[in-house]
């Protein structure tokens, strides 16, 4: 597969019907990665992570539900923990508003049906009234279920 790198972060998977066209994510930027060095599995996991970030910026809870497992829990920078539905409710009602998300220096690892995507999130957001740009490094876990990468809790 031939990949073309545009604007430092946009991958167009030529010959695959633009399957991984990161430029469709208008509120998500990738920095510090050469996607042409990723294999198909790594690229698909990174694409799913970027797709989730775009859904966050659009408050597209239906897409978020497609990507996130039902038993997922979220831990905020403050330490507050929420179930998937509690978190999605806050996104839907605007308590959490994401304007743009940068994915800096992502590292993708795939082992069978499990994948990790580790990166520094640069979130421009209004989180419960605290507006600004927030930087957080984290690892996101995905499990391949029926051919799709689904965000899951950290495996124990």
Q: Positions of the model-derived regions?
A:
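Short solvent-exposed beta->alpha transition segments
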Residues: 46, 65-102
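Hydrophobic pocket/interface hotspot
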Residues: 52, 64, 72, 87, ...
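A mature extracytoplasmic/lumenal domain signature
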Residues: 68, 78-79, 102, 107, ...
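Short hydrophobic/aromatic-rich beta-strand segments that constitute the beta-sheet cores
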Residues: 74-75, 117, 151-153
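Bacterial N-terminal signal peptides
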Residues: 1-8
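Short beta-strand edge/turn micro-motifs at domain boundaries
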Residues: 14-27, 135-156
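Short, low-complexity N-terminal intrinsically disordered segments enriched in polar/charged residues
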Residues: 13-70
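Surface-exposed, charged secondary-structure patches
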Residues: 14, 88-130
């Amino acid at each position: 597969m031939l990949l073309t790198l545009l604007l430092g972060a946009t991958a167009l998977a030529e010959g695959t019907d633009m399957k991984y066209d990161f430029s469709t994510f208008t509120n998500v930027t990738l920095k510090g990665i050469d996607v042409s060095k990723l294999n198909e599995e790594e690229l698909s996991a990174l694409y799913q992570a970027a797709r989730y970030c775009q859904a966050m910026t659009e408050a597209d809870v239906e897409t978020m539900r497609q990507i996130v497992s039902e038993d997922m829990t979220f831990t905020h920078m403050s330490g507050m923990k929420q179930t998937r539905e509690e978190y999605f409710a806050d996104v839907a009602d605007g308590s959490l508003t994401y304007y743009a998300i940068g994915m800096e220096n992502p590292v993708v690892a795939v082992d069978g049906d499990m994948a990790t995507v580790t990166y520094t999130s640069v979130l421009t957001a209004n989180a419960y009234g605290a507006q600004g740009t927030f930087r957080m490094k984290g690892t996101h876990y995905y499990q391949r279920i029926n051919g799709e990468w689904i965000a899951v809790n950290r495996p124990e």
